[in-house]
Amino acid sequence: MIEFVYPHTQLVAGVDEVGRGPLVGAVVTAAVILDPARPIAGLNDSKKLSEKRRLALYEEIKEKALSWSLGRAEPHEIDELNILHATMLAMQRAVAGLHIAPEYVLIDGNRCPKLPMPAMAVVKGDSRVPEISAASILAKVTRDAEMAALDIVFPQYGFAQHKGYPTAFHLEKLAEHGATEHHRRSFGPVKRALGLAS
């Protein structure tokens, strides 16, 4: 992996998203400015960490970061805007929520939202840039907790297991029970289920 070269600036925020692919729930983003004086060991892409390790790092990031913030776009916004534009909006919200304004923002992936400060997209940034890794962890732990809470209300769909992704089980239950108000109506499988359910 090519080592990432940081921009010449002090306050760098990392931004990542979780939940572009699921059929249900919000897309959740996080923005994090780490404190160089309080390093956090073991930051890595949240998908490569065990749940136990993610939860421990989640608490450590919130405690040690100079600033952190969550952003989100709800299912109705995803349906109105499309998933790409809703993700960009959620990233803008996460950056706007930082109580310290970053001088530069590094975004995981290959697209940047419009921001009031310079920004750069970093491909595979969640495994190359600690700030993005930290954002990835905050976003994933937050969204996973939301899916676990939704699972209590709608146990028949198995949200706690598949986190809303279009698994065979989820698609089967969607066809059987129809969509909840938390499903993204613009996504093909949900559209089809609504057709079946009506």
Swiss-Prot record:
One of its GO terms (cellular component) is cytoplasm. Its cofactor is Mn(2+); Mg(2+). Pfam families: RNase_HII. It catalyses: Endonucleolytic cleavage to 5'-phosphomonoester. It is an enzyme of class 3 (hydrolase). CDD domains: RNase_HII_bacteria_HII_like. It is found in: Cytoplasm. Residues 10-198 form the RNase H type-2 domain. Its main location: cytoplasm. Manganese or magnesium. Binds 1 divalent metal ion per monomer in the absence of substrate. May bind a second metal ion after substrate binding. GO terms for biological process: DNA replication, removal of RNA primer; mismatch repair; ribonucleotide excision repair. The keyword Hydrolase applies. A divalent metal cation binds at residues 16-17, 108. GO terms for molecular function: manganese ion binding; RNA binding; RNA-DNA hybrid ribonuclease activity. The keyword Cytoplasm applies. Keywords: Cytoplasm, Endonuclease, Hydrolase, Manganese, Metal-binding, Nuclease. Its EC number is 3.1.26.4. InterPro entries: RNase_HII (IPR022898), RNase_HII/HIII (IPR001352), RNase_HII/HIII_dom (IPR024567), RNaseH-like_sf (IPR012337), RNaseH_sf (IPR036397). Endonuclease that specifically degrades the RNA of RNA-DNA hybrids. PANTHER family: RIBONUCLEASE H2 SUBUNIT A (PTHR10954), RIBONUCLEASE HII (PTHR10954:SF18). NCBIfam families: PRK00015.1-1, PRK00015.1-3, PRK00015.1-4. Belongs to the RNase HII family. This is Ribonuclease HII.
